[in-house]
Regions:
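Acidic, PIN/NYN-like endoribonuclease modules and their adjacent C-terminal/linker elements
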Residues: 2, 105-136
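An alpha-helix initiation/capping motif
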Residues: 44-45, 82
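Short, flexible helix/strand-to-coil boundary loops that buttress conserved ligand/catalytic motifs
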Residues: 14, 54, 92, 128-131
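A generic structural signal for short hydrophobic patches within well-formed alpha-helices
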Residues: 10, 47, 124-125
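Active-site neighborhoods of divalent-metal-dependent phosphate/nucleic-acid chemistry enzymes
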Residues: 75-120
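Conserved N-terminal glycine/acidic-rich loop preference
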Residues: 66-69, 74-86, 96, 125-136
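Short, well-structured N-terminal submotif of metal-dependent ribonuclease cores
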Residues: 1-42, 54-68
Length: 136
């Protein structure tokens, strides 16, 4: 199983925003117990979203924490290629997701059926084929 992270989940974890960070950590632990060989995946959009606030605030320490996560050798990257963008457009039309969310959903679907989308946004559940775990 490949766990695809939406930006909010990782931002809560890396930045340690409580009580959200503890909740996300606990839910990820539960998912990991159910899928012990789980790998992590992200999109380039996710990379951008996670870096914006630390860069805007000149927060080198937080940026370094994100960069440490993004340089993990076991991390699976989903690039924003033509197939992803075309699928995102269809998802946006069918399900009314905002463009960034449609891009995330389309990116996750590139991973095949053995994926979990970890997000705090329940709107992803509207997308057929997405295996969503809503992080509360």
């Amino acid at each position: 199983v490949i766990a695809f992270f939406d930006a909010s989940a990782l931002i809560y974890l890396i930045e340690g925003k409580e009580p959200f960070a503890s909740r996300v950590r606990n839910q990820i632990s539960e998912v990991t117990q159910a899928h012990p060989n789980m790998r992590a995946a992200v999109s380039r959009l996710f990379w951008l979203e996670c870096r914006v606030d630390p860069m805007k605030n000149n927060d080198a320490a937080t940026l370094a924490l994100f960069d440490a996560f993004f340089t993990r050798p076991d991390l699976v990257w989903v690039e924003l290629n033509q197939a992803v963008v075309e699928l995102a457009a269809a998802i946006r039309v069918r399900h009314g997701l905002r463009t960034p969310d449609a891009l995330q959903a389309a990116s996750c679907l590139q991973l095949g059926s053995r994926h979990l989308l970890l997000s705090s946004d329940a709107a992803f559940q509207r997308v057929h084929g997405l295996n969503v775990t809503v992080l509360s």
